[in-house]
Amino acid sequence: MNTGVQYYRAPFPEMEYWEQDFKNIRNAGLNTVQLWVLWGWVESTPGKFDFSDYDRLVELAEKNNLQVVLSSIAEIQPMWIHREVPGSEMIDRFGKKVISTIRHECNFGLTPGGCTDNPGVQERMKLFLESCAKHYVDCPNLHGWDLWNELRWNIQADELVCFCPHTIEEFRNFLKQRYGSLDGLNEAWKRRYIDWQDVMPGKAPDRPYSEMMAWQDFITYRANAHGAWRYSVMRNIDKVHTMTAHGASPSIGYSGDQQTYPIDRGNDWELAKGMDGIGCSSFPVWFNIDDAEFGSRIEMVNAAANGKHIWLSELQGGRAGIGFDLTGEVSPEQQQRWLWNGIACGADTILFWCWRDEVFGRESGNFGLYGNDEYSAERIKAMSESGKIISENSSLIDNYKPDSAQVGILFSPDSYYLAWAQEGSALKMQKAIDGYARALVKHSIASTFIESEHLENLDRFKFIILPRVVALGKEAEEKLLSFVENGGTLLVESECAAFDKAGLYRYPEKRFLNRLGIREAGRRQLITPVEFTIGGKTLSLGCDQWLTPFAIGENAPAEVFARYKNEILAARYSCGKGSVIALGSYFGNSYLETENSDFEQMMYSFAAEAKVERTFEMLTNDFIYVKSGSSEGRQMLFCFFPDSEKVCRLRLNRADFNGSYTDILSGNIIKADNGFLEFKSLHRNLAVLVENK
């Protein structure tokens, strides 16, 4: 288990602090430092690579028994890039050259720089990456590489990019690969193009969906390919060390805005396939991320990693702030929750941002774990305590795996692309996913995330949820139909897969659910809340956007949950060996706004009906976040207590279990009574229980 801090973003901190800082970092219980190796800094003169400051830092790290993560920051380009590669500027959607500048939080180097589809820029970048790998491949304390920081490539472009001739040519090549020919494209898009030169990217939202969705899809593909390219360049030289990349958030959380497309930084599922793992940044106080959301966030990364390395590549070190605005302080209790939650979710490398407060630009005076705020000394003390516990239990933690989930929540990039093509944001789609994930966490029902182009091994699930999945491809539809017919339970919301991958609307009789005898009757005006009856209980549920009741057809519902006037609004349908729960509106979005306990109860009932097996059932009144897993044949329970609840009571699914657990944080021993556990937190509102053998 590697726990560490980001330390150096050249040229800060200055050399006078290095030696003592590295001693303090090791004394704080941390074992790793991360260094930003900036292309613009290292190759400030074309063809001359100066690693002297990094060499000194790597040497000091080894002296203090610290491992090193090197972040190859190729996206901060040299100031000379446009002189050496004329015409390499990115082009925005209005045909204007993008003027690159020094980035707002980095002291030297251009952003966004030259377009990486330009062969000249790519060749220069390759030389930098190769130089980094050759220089440090034999470094004895090198832990690994973070190949692409927050997957950034269009920061400070100030507009949607890139529309340069190289990128547009690659876009057309992408379409040729997908559709085979112009005739194939015309058939899919219902067009009459006669020349590929006429096929252009989508320019703006609220225009025809087909080219806008295809362009966004290409931009994601392009980022995936660039990440794989960076990996191949480095892997050709360094055959040993772990190489990952990380986004500012998981790809599910990247819904786009006026200057960015959704998922334009790449799709974590594809990025992880092309590397040794994947990671993400998390600043919980800054962005008001609580235990439940943090756990879901890291599970998104875990799901995409698919058994590969999971890195918490930037975890909030100290108080955040931008410019003259401050956010809340980071207490040691909060920070330790994130650390142990990350471990509970399967992370094997956790790096805090950063050691000292920043000193440049908008981030000045903030973010330091060892920063100048009132909690700094307490954070260091708490980190030292945890570092000792992690070291003493290193084998246990290194071999830990979270429990597998039997509930899958579907992420459909096509639905994100469709939403952005209309509204310039896919936030509604993101919030729908977040809503269902949160409701399941609140009932301690383990869930994970599946991506619509990576639907392998669906038989591991008993229950799959499609939150606001309005666009879907045929291959995904076929796999979901097989899942239901083979005994799975599928939950769908309004107008599920109403649009195809080209953004063309399909009438209800043309949608894949019609093959199961489930057909919507059309859109109705929104009325909210809606009254449900489930298991003899009446529930009041908020919904969103519109109502789409279901027509009465060949497949009569096995159970009706809600009606709109005389029409069926929500029902369960028997389909083959499985079933479909069809909801005629968007309920996850409404839940995320209100956290209505009736929605949580509905999801609890649906999971139980689907025979989802649970490791434990929580018996306390207030929500206690618990994550379960195992290591070396022993069950582990990570428990995160709120201030309002001092005692955790839960029932294991091992009714006859009368063994015991040790809380490795406090040393407390807890005895089970026929599968029932009751215990308190004796350490910072946390408990990490390990089954005794």
Task: Please report, for each region that a protein language model flagged, where it lies by residue.
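Conserved, mostly hydrophobic/aromatic
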Residues: 5, 25, 33, 61, ...
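A short, well-structured beta->alpha microelement
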Residues: 437-457
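Hydrophobic targeting/anchoring helices
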Residues: 246-435, 522-527, 534, 540-542, ...
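Short, acidic/polar
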Residues: 12-27, 125-131, 257-271, 331-339, ...
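Aromatic-lined substrate-binding rim segments of carbohydrate-active enzymes
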Residues: 18-27, 31-101, 130-133, 224, ...
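Polysaccharide-binding and catalytic clefts of secreted carbohydrate-active enzymes
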Residues: 92-294, 300
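A conserved amphipathic helix/loop scaffold
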Residues: 459, 467-693
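The substrate-binding groove and active-site-proximal loops of carbohydrate-active enzymes
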Residues: 3-14, 36-52, 106-126, 151, ...
